[in-house]
Amino acid sequence: MFKEEIVVEHLVNVNRVTKVVKGGRRFSFSACVVLGNKAGKVGYGHGKAKEVGEARLKALQNAKKYMIEVPLYKGRTIHYDVYGKSGAAKVMLRRARAGTGIIAGGAMRFIFDSLGIQDVVAKSFGSSNSYLMIAATLNALKQLETPRVIAERRGLRLNELSVTIYKTFHEG
């Protein structure tokens, strides 16, 4: 589906998982992957298999299946501040001026890099589990809409949005 558009692939983590059975222990591997095209599309997935390579491939297939599109402001940051949550992980994403860079910790950095976001400030609260952090970040990014979509939903023209919102969207 998005195969030709994928530019960046980040392997977030690989874990060895042990299942205890009657005859002893069975080992397998789980992998978490973030994919993106550096132009507003990103997805993540995880896979589990007996070999690391197979787990990575399953994670890639899973990530391709669940890619989302995120509107970017001037192709470099998000339109407005947003919050996301998944389980005990909470994230706050804030837009940033040009030249700020990606100020984010943990797995969030992989998502922003894959999306093509160059300037953003992100803070995580609660759990630092990478799976939850990625899910919380994507939940926050799913909430983003362009000012045009917001204005249409409210039945307004773009310049009729509140003055502060209009300035936010037009003064970098």
UniProtKB/Swiss-Prot annotation:
Pfam families: Ribosomal_S5, Ribosomal_S5_C. Residues 7-70 form the S5 DRBM domain. The keyword Protein biosynthesis does not apply. InterPro entries: Ribosomal_Su5_D2-typ_SF, Ribosomal_uS5, Ribosomal_uS5_bac-type, Ribosomal_uS5_C, Ribosomal_uS5_N, Ribosomal_uS5_N_CS, Ribsml_uS5_D2-typ_fold_subgr. Keywords: Ribonucleoprotein, Ribosomal protein, RNA-binding, rRNA-binding. GO terms for cellular component: small ribosomal subunit. GO terms for biological process: translation. The keyword Protein biosynthesis does not apply. One of its GO terms (molecular function) is structural constituent of ribosome. The N-terminal domain interacts with the head of the 30S subunit; the C-terminal domain interacts with the body and contacts protein S4. The interaction surface between S4 and S5 is involved in control of translational fidelity. Belongs to the universal ribosomal protein uS5 family. This is Small ribosomal subunit protein uS5. The gene is rpsE.
